[in-house]
A protein has these predicted regions:
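Short intrinsically disordered terminal tails
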Residues: 1-5, 52-58
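Short, charged, amphipathic alpha-helical segments
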Residues: 12, 36-47
Length: 58
């Protein structure tokens, strides 16, 4: 069983939102709307949040 199968609906929605935010940061960086440093900061923050949710679901 994968960790995401244990998520509540609210946690699943939160993970999805973090994944979208992370993806949008990479797109914004690729199009020159934000710096690489800003993109890295957003990606790191989203990854940490997803990891915390995953650890709670494991």
């Amino acid at each position: 069983m994968n960790w995401h199968e244990n998520l509540s609906e609210a946690d699943n929605k939160a993970v999805t939102n973090y994944e979208v935010e992370r993806s949008n940061a990479l797109v914004d960086w690729a199009h020159g709307r934000i710096s690489m440093a800003e993109a890295r900061e957003i990606v790191a923050r989203c990854n940490k949040a997803i990891q915390r949710i995953a650890e709670g679901a494991a």
